[in-house]
Amino acid sequence: MWIDTHCHLDAPEFSSSLASIISAAKDKNVRAILLPAVKAADSESVRMLASQYSNEIPGLVYTLGIHPLYTNQTQESDLNLLEEQITGALVDPRFVGVGEIGLDYFVEDLDPHQQEYIFHAQLELAEQFQLPVILHVRRSQDAILKALRRRNIPGGIAHAFNGSFQQAEQFIELGFKLGFGGAATYERALQIRRLIKELPLESIVTETDAPDIPPAWLRSENLAFNEPAFMPRIARGLAAIRGINESEFASRVWRNAMQVLPRWSALCADNPNLIQIS
């Protein structure tokens, strides 16, 4: 069984064919997917998707948060709404944390001060509710590490990690797993491949970030966009980089995700279709 710890099933690219996208993932034995919200307004849509497709993907879960790319238009009222949404979601076993949150210092037209304000406010919520976080860390690893050290956050996932080995070690020390996916399928991705090969295996989780971060074969095979059904193929590439068999790798990254997201682990432990791994 495979796990995708970061997939935007609510993206517009999937809207006209979501049922077939989910079915394809199920056929490829993807049994758990994490769907992170990117805006406070997404709360109901991600919750409904996680519930609607739970028979097909029994480990389908969601997180709530405001992505840094949407911080320019975020108001104080959105943060208040997010707190209300998190409070209400605590009774839902498919709600597993706060995310996608973080900082993005690559996109030039984002106000860094606004980003930082929204990010710190969401870290405060994660600390208040003692929930793990799903982090967006593009060119912002050091700033995020500094913020995390000031808070008592119960770990989480640094999604699409592409930092240094030293930064990776610091995230791990703070209780985080590191997400890797399609970027590692490119031969030129030497730093990412080194991280996958040399980091402790217990620190790694798998993700697609679908429909984004296309794997290397996407264009050559005339595929429109990334999707969760590609998780096994991507993960097999990661296992090959690591030098271990895919069965061992699949089992290990599943346990890693469950370890860092205990509400996800509890959901899977209650499901007879998933209990043998969780």
Show where each model-derived region lies.
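Mid-domain alpha/beta scaffold segments of enzyme catalytic cores
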Residues: 1-278
